[in-house]
From Swiss-Prot:
GO biological process terms on file: mitochondrial respiratory chain complex I assembly
Protein's UniProt keywords contain Transmembrane: yes
Gene source species: Drosophila melanogaster (Fruit fly)
Keyword DNA damage: no
Role this protein plays: As part of the MCIA complex, involved in the assembly of the mitochondrial complex I.
InterPro entries xrefs: TMEM126
Protein name: Transmembrane protein 126
Keyword terms of this UniProt record: Membrane, Mitochondrion, Transmembrane, Transmembrane helix
Main location (coarse class): mitochondrion
Family, as annotated: Belongs to the TMEM126 family.
Membrane-spanning residues: 40-62, 79-99, 124-144, 172-192
Mitochondrial intermembrane side of membrane: 63-78, 145-171
Location(s) in or outside the cell: Mitochondrion membrane
Length: 223
């Protein structure tokens, strides 16, 4: 059965009213059990793809600062968890809740470009900007604690700390700009595919429902 949204006074008498959570669960049941993966691949795999991109970017940024500050094996887990794992998890959750949920529950209820832009903003913020801000702080902290690199005191010489941060960050600025552009474009493309495939899935469900209704209608008899 295809889902549809309507006002209470517009509901047919035999309509089954369900909550948004129930509707979302029903939609996911259809998507995961759909026999043609090519028709629903973006809905299934986009959160995982975006999560992997965020994890890869976080690992790249974290490794850059760790290498510059000669950390070696010091604090490896303590930096990878917040800079690699957390962005990956938050990126997936943000996409599922703020992007996929509106697409599945209210198709055509919002401007497609607006959804794509919002999705790209979440991806670049959580997957690139957040690790870029956190990674140098974590690396500086462990470098000071483990004595792997001489870090000026941030309270006594904040300007020197800033210059050191700029020195280490400048080499990866072009790469970060490229990553932001590529991830934004890929995220917008995948989100557009989600919107398109969900709409086609809804039309297909209505078509199947119409066929079933026709098959169960009593045969017309002409005299």
């Amino acid at each position: 059965m295809a889902l549809s949204r309507a006002k209470p006074d517009e509901l047919p008498r035999d309509a089954v009213v369900i909550t948004e959570d129930q509707a979302l669960k029903y939609q996911w049941k259809i998507i995961t059990s759909w026999d043609k993966i090519g028709e629903v691949w973006s809905l299934r795999y986009t959160p995982g793809i975006l999560s992997a991109l965020a994890a890869g970017t976080g690992a790249y940024i974290n490794n850059h600062y760790r290498t510059k500050l000669r950390l070696g094996g010091h604090g490896r887990l303590s930096t990878y968890l917040p800079i690699v794992a957390v962005p990956a998890i938050f990126t997936m959750l943000a996409h599922k809740f703020f992007i996929q949920r509106p697409i599945l529950l209210n198709p055509l209820g919002e401007c497609p470009v607006c959804i794509q832009m919002r999705s790209a903003a979440f991806q670049t913020s959580l997957g690139i900007v957040y690790p870029t801000i956190l990674a140098p702080f974590a690396a500086f902290l462990f470098a000071t604690r483990c004595y792997t690199y001489r870090i000026p005191s941030i309270t006594e010489n904040p300007r020197e700390v800033f210059l050191l941060w700029r020195k280490f960050t400048r080499p990866i600025v072009p790469a970060l700009g490229t990553l932001i552009g590529l991830q934004a474009l890929l995220t917008m493309f995948l989100t557009g595919q989600e919107d398109k495939q969900n709409f086609k899935l809804m039309l297909r469900m209505r078509e199947i429902e119409h066929q079933v209704e026709e098959e169960h209608l009593p045969q017309r008899m002409d005299f």
